[in-house]
């Protein structure tokens, strides 16, 4: 007997994948490339609407209704913040630091002063001379530290990654360093970047969502259902609450699928 299904019981959404509809030389994306793949989807919702026009008689009584201009919008949240998703929402691509494509990266670093120790090493090689402050007990910044050519009193010396302090700091005190470094993907020197620019917007995509469920009459055999948007546009609008329990929201609109015929 041919497979048939009517009443479908949903267990959960397994994953959602968006693939590129075409080549994008600017972003280095080829047709069919995965733009993002997420597997922590929560609160998925599909909203379908249309516009109606009523035909009326001489007394303005509706005698017929015609519908046109269908539209569909899908919205959901990913339980985890996803770099590829926000890159697609921003109309760009996630950049990973390598030797060929380095990333200028900011760094906040704290050094704990130990008794009798004057030499310390920064985690990264600064691009320019770091700005240094005394770190107060409540975590706020105190006096600015002078960086000189000789370590004396509260004056310190910075040579590449090496830091030499004077004798003006008590054991247990802290110095706060602010600097930029070049991430090149080597061990301990990696970075990932997503840039949201004013002139970049999401590209068209095909979105496929995998849903796990079962026939209401046979819940022992699980069935995979697929919700497919052949021509979709991810919205660049999103509200991201930056907190431990926050989610990553996204929405997309379904577009009419058109084919360009060539002779």
Language-model segment annotations:
Residues 137-138, 157-160, 165-171, 222-263:
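Mixed-charge, glycine-accented linear interaction segment located at domain edges/termini
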Residues 78-82, 181-183, 211-215, 231-236, ...:
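Beta-strand elements of well-folded, non-transmembrane domains
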Residues 2-89, 144, 152, 225-249:
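Solvent-exposed edge beta-strands and adjacent loop segments
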Residues 73-77, 176, 206-208, 249-253:
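Beta-strand secondary-structure signal
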Residues 25-27, 83-84, 168-174, 185, ...:
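Short, surface-exposed beta-strand/loop "edge" segments at domain boundaries and coil↔beta transitions
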Residues 39, 47-49, 77-79, 114, ...:
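A structural detector for beta-sheet-dominated domains
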Residues 84-152, 180-206, 210-221:
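Extended beta-strand solenoid/passenger and fiber regions
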Residues 69-73, 166-176:
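Extracellular interaction modules
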């Amino acid at each position: 007997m041919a497979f048939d299904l009517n009443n479908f019981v949903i267990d959960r959404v397994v994953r959602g994948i968006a693939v590129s509809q075409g080549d994008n030389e600017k972003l280095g994306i080829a047709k069919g490339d995965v733009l993002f793949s997420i597997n922590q989807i929560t609160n998925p919702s599909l909203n379908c609407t249309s516009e109606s026009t009523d035909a009326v008689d001489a007394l303005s009584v509706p005698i017929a209704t015609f519908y046109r201009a269908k539209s569909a919008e899908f919205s959901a949240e990913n339980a985890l913040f996803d770099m590829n998703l926000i890159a697609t929402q921003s109309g760009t691509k996630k950049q990973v630091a390598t030797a060929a494509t380095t990333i200028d990266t900011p760094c906040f670093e704290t050094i704990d002063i130990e008794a009798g120790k004057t030499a310390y090493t920064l985690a990264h090689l600064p691009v320019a001379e770091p700005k240094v402050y005394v770190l107060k007990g409540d975590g706020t910044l105190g006096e600015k530290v002078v960086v000189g050519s000789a370590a004396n009193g509260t004056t310190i010396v910075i040579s590449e990654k090496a830091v030499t302090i004077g004798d003006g700091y008590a054991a247990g005190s802290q110095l706060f360093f602010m600097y930029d470094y070049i991430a090149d993907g080597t061990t301990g020197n990696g970075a990932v970047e997503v840039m949201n620019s004013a002139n970049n917007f999401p590209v068209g995509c095909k979105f496929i969502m995998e849903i796990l469920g079962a026939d209401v009459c046979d819940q022992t055999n699980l069935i995979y259902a697929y919700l497919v948007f052949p021509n979709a546009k991810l919205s660049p609008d999103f509200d991201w609450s930056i907190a431990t329990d926050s989610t990553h929201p996204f929405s997309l609109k379904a577009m009419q699928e058109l084919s360009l015929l060539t002779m």
